[in-house]
A protein has these predicted regions:
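Double-stranded beta-helix
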Residues: 7-15, 80-93
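A short, N-terminal "cap"/entry segment at the start of jelly-roll beta-barrel domains
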Residues: 1-26
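Ligand-binding loop in jelly-roll beta-barrel domains
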Residues: 64-89
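Short, conserved beta-strand element in jelly-roll/cupin
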Residues: 28-42
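Short acidic-glycine-tyrosine-enriched beta hairpin
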Residues: 48-65
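Short histidine-centered beta-strand/loop micro-motifs
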Residues: 20-28, 44-45, 52-53, 70-72, ...
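Beta-strand-centric surfaces of beta-sandwich/beta-rich domains
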Residues: 35, 58-61, 74
Length: 93
């Protein structure tokens, strides 16, 4: 299993930055894994358009340059791990 080269701090429903709540993407060559630690949140992918409701213990992969946004659904805690290669190719996300 590969280790992330960087991780965000743990965010809650109050500390989640506006930049993550709005549409954004990772850079070329950067995969993001969103990890819900507690509670629930919504992950919206822009292209192709889809929505995923996530609960504690779940993780979701964001591909390089894939536009997306997140929104808390009540109290929650989450973080994002960043990888320089596809973590799904090595082990379950």
């Amino acid at each position: 299993m590969i280790a992330p080269y960087r991780s965000t701090p743990v965010f809650d429903e109050n500390s989640l930055p506006a930049a993550l709540r709005g549409e954004h993407s990772t850079k070329a060559g950067v995969w993001g894994v969103i990890r819900v630690l507690e509670g629930r949140m919504r992950l919206d992918y822009a292209d192709p358009p889809s929505t995923r409701l996530m609960e504690a213990g779940e993780a979701a992969l964001c591909l390089p340059q894939q536009a997306h946004s997140v929104a808390p659904l009540g109290p929650m805690r989450m973080r994002v791990d960043f990888y320089d290669r596809d973590p799904a190719g090595d082990a379950p996300v």
